[in-house]
Every structure is written in C-alpha cells, then in structure tokens.
C-alpha cells in the first residue's frame, strides 16, 4: 500500500480532544499561526487545514464564545439582506465573530426567527450595520490569529473569501444585480424646416411635400396617365408638338415618301405623253387605212381618263 493511501486512512476527521487542543496551542505559540504544514506534522491524524480551522474558529484568542447580542443580530440580518450567504464578508463587520459561527447562528436562530415572526430582515432602527460601505468597517483579525495582531488593512465587505465561495456554490445565495435606470432625454421643441421632394421635371414649379401622400386616381393609373401627371410637359413644347403634328397632317407624308411618289408620277406622265404622241401618229395614219393605235380605243380612253384624273388630283401641269 502506498504512503499517500496510508496517510489518508490514518487521518482523523472527528472532533478534537482536549489533548489535541492543548498541543495545537503550544505549537502555534512555538511556530506561529501560519506554519500549518509544520504544525500538522506534530499532531498525528490532523492535516494542516484541519489545524488552521480549529485554531481560527475555536482556539484563537480573538474568537468570541459568548452569546450573540441583539445588536450583532441586527447587524447580521442587515448584512445578510445585502450580501446573502457571504459569511466571510459578514464576519468582517463583527469583531471576534468567525464566518463559521455567524453561519451557524443564522441557520440555527436568526433564519427561523425571521420566518416565524414574518420580519423582512431589513431593520431600519438604530445600531448595527446600516449598509453604508463608505464608512470604515471594523478590522478583521488575521486568518491565523495570534496575539490579536491586525493586518492593518480594511477589507471590503464585497470581496469574497473563505466560506463565501462554498456558500455561493450551494445554490441558496442571493444574487444582487445593479438596476440600470433609463433616462429619457427631452427632445428639442424646435421644429425643423419642412422638407420638399420634387417629382416634376427641373423646369416645373410643382412640388410635392414628403409628408403629403400622392393622390392617385385608379383610372389614371390604369390608362397609363400616371407618368404624365407626375412629369408634366411644358406648354411651349406642347405647342411645338401640336404644330409639327398639324404640319404632318397638312403636308401629307414624309420627304422620302413624297420623293418616291413624285418619281412614280413623273414616270407615269412620261408614259402618258408618249402614248399621246403615238395616238396622234396613229390617228394621222388611220386615214390611209394603214395602222391604228396600238391598243383598242376603249382601253386607251380609259387609261387616258385615269391618268388625267391622277394629274388633276395632284396638280402637276408639266414635269421634265
């Protein structure tokens, strides 16, 4: 069997005997209240932690063994309402009281007293701890005690140590979170100048306000006139467009089309004049009983009448 296992089996976990207490006191006076590993070697079955806890909680001259006073009870209740089960923090507020003694006193007496009497555990009376962390709190004794020597430091009640860590892991600790206050800043009463959004073309004077909705007519939107209403046309351009349309209607067709028509008419007229000349020649030779016109008289007359009608309608007299 290994040495660590043998040592664990030889550990004594029961209460301390008076002989062990006397030996511990002598060893602390000899080696000081800090050399717990060295002290534990002289006490069979006791570890350094066990020696330290026995000294700090019971054998130290700074530890008070008297009953808790009413003032101490009120201080514990106020501190517990603020810090919860942070017994080491609360013990710094009471001289001569250990965190273990305060915890036992709370669980055995004060907790039941608050639940039975229906107290809120938050006294507003005189005496005890008033919850003001700004004031100087009583000095906490050193962890090892020893002749009432103080560390010379004011420990903050908010710093966890010792039994605070073990109590926080138990699940019954009260958690106090700061409350964030939201402050609403007053907005300026001055109104901003109105903002305008123009939906018209640059040369128009019509403007539409942002905060005023655009009124749309369903018929107008369906007919495709929505763009015309949002983008009005200048009167000058509208007049020019109307004049161009009027010219187009009065002048007939475009220039290219008119050129083609004129060429067709010119060709037709030349053909017509050639037919007339051939008709005249045919008329002069008809007296000799020779030939006649190249086409029948009825067809020639109809063709001549059609050509004369075209020439008269267009108004062309003579074309080269």
From Swiss-Prot:
Q: Where are the transmembrane segments?
A: none
| Segments of the chain annotated as binding DNA | 36-59, 87-110
Tell me which SMART domains the record gives.
Answer: SANT (SM00717)
Induction of expression: Induced by salt stress.
Q: Does the keyword Cytoplasm apply?
A: no
Phenotype when the gene is knocked out: No visible phenotype under normal growth conditions, but mutant seedlings exhibit increased survival rate upon salt stress.
Q: Tell me, what is one Gene Ontology molecular-function annotation carried by this entry?
A: DNA-binding transcription factor activity
Question: What does this gene product do?
Answer: Transcription factor that functions in salt stress response. Acts as a negative regulator of NHX7/SOS1 and CBL4/SOS3 induction in response to salt stress. In response to auxin, activates the transcription of the auxin-responsive gene IAA19. The IAA19 transcription activation by MYB73 is enhanced by direct interaction between MYB73 and PYL8.
Know the name of this protein?
Transcription factor MYB73
